[in-house]
Regions:
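Vicinal oxygen chelate
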Residues: 1-2, 79, 83-123
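N-terminal beta-strand motif that seeds the catalytic metal site of vicinal oxygen chelate
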Residues: 1-18, 48, 66-70, 118-123
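Acidic di-acidic motifs
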Residues: 15, 74, 106
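Conserved active-site tyrosine of GNAT-family acetyltransferases
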Residues: 19-26, 82, 109
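Conserved short beta-strand elements that form part of the metal-binding/catalytic scaffold
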Residues: 30-63, 111-117
């Protein structure tokens, strides 16, 4: 098998319209299209996020506890912008010596992170 790349990241939600407002209006991701059966796709840079309600195909909903890291130019500025829009963060912004990270959740409890690597990657 040859994997070409990750095609999309699936984000399960309970309220698609509320999620659309959060991901598109609050986070500023680019809306692409509605998905038949309920849901939508939006873009974070070159990564497609497919946001949908799993209950539409009789699957249970459970929020994803594993962070989706959103790369931003300045974590402090992005955090201040989101806090101004009512987004609550889980903890102080972390400086790991390699990157800055700030953790938060979407309205359905899916884990998200603002991220910026500032140290060079090792070869």
């Amino acid at each position: 098998m040859q994997v070409e790349h990750v095609d999309f990241v699936s984000i399960c939600v309970m309220d698609v319209e509320r999620a659309r407002k959060f991901y598109v209006d609050t986070l500023g991701l680019r809306f692409d299209r509605d998905v038949p059966g309920g849901g939508f796709e939006c873009w974070a840079g070159q990564v497609c996020l497919s946001v949908w309600d799993p209950r539409t195909i009789d699957l249970p909903f459970a929020p994803n506890p594993n962070d989706i890291a959103l790369r931003v130019p300045d974590v402090a500025a992005a955090r201040a912008d989101l806090e101004g829009k009512g987004v609550e963060f889980s903890a102080k912004t972390l400086d790991t010596g390699v990157c800055h990270m700030a953790f938060f959740h979407d309205p359905d409890g899916n884990a998200l992170m603002l991220h910026r690597r500032y140290a060079a990657r090792e070869s």
